[in-house]
Amino acid sequence: MLGLLKKTPSADETPTPGPFGRFYLQELINRGGMADIWLATDERQKPYALRRMHQRLRFNLLARRRFVRGAEILSRITDHDGIVGYVEHGKIQGQLYLLMDYVEASNLKELYSRQDQVLLENVAQILIDMAVALEHMHENGYMHLDFKPENVLVTRNANVRLVDFDLAQQIPDKPLKPSKKNPGTPAYMAPEQLLGEPFTHHVDIFSYGVAAYELLTNEKPFPGDTPREILNRQLDRSTFTNPRQHNPDIPPGMEKVILRCLERDAGRRYPFVGLMVREIQAALYA
C-alpha cells in the first residue's frame, strides 16, 4: 500500500468510499495531516493512488499552495524509477487531488519496525536507490525538505519510490530563509533548520544521514522528545554514538558516509548528492 503517516479521522471528517468525479474511491490507504490517500479506480477499473486534500483545509491558502506546488514538482521529476509516478492533478467538487500510479508497497518506517524480510535482504540496494532518487530530484533543481522513512516506499520486489513533495522547493541560488512555521519533521531536520537559519539543499543530505543511521541501527542519531532536545543533541555531540557501535556489521565506509551527512556545518557535508551516491556504492559493494 502507499504508506504515509497514519492519523485518526476526526468525528466530522470520517472518510467513506464512493464516487469522486470520474473516479471511484475504493479503499482508504492512509491519512496524512493534509490529505487522504485512496485506492481509486476509473471507468475502466484501472487502479490509481488518489491523494485528496482534506475538506477542512479548503480555505487554508498556505496548505492549498503547498499541495499544488508539490503536485507540480512531482510532475516535473516523475520520469525516474525512484519517484512515484505522476498522472494528473486538479480539482473535483472543490477539492484538490493528485492522481498517481498505484504502488503495492510499505514505507520504510513500517518495514524496519517489523523487521520485514524485504528490508533485511535488500537493505544495501534500498540505501543506494533512495539516495539515487534524491539525486534525481536535486539534479532537476528541487530539494525535498521532508526526506524521512515514511516518505520512502518499498515494494515487495524492493523497488524504491520517493513520495510526498508538499514541502519541496526549488534549490535556491543562495541560502533560503525559513518560514516562520518552519514545517518539517524535527527528528530529520538539520541544525540550521531547527535554528531558523537560512539553508540549502544540504538539509536533504542531513536528512538522508538520519534515515540511513536509523535504518541500519534502529536508533535515532539525535533522540529527543522536542525540537529543542533534538537540536541540543545535534549541537553537543558528547553523547553521540557512532553507527558501528550500535551495529558492528555496518561497513566502515558506510559509517563514514553517514557521519559526513550528519555534520553540524552544512559546508562539511557532501556538496552534492551524486558524490554521496558514489561513496555509498563503493562502501556497500566494494
PLM region spans:
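Activation segment signature within eukaryotic-like protein kinase domains
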Residues: I126-L127
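Protein kinase catalytic-loop region centered on the HRD/HxD motif
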Residues: V132-Y142
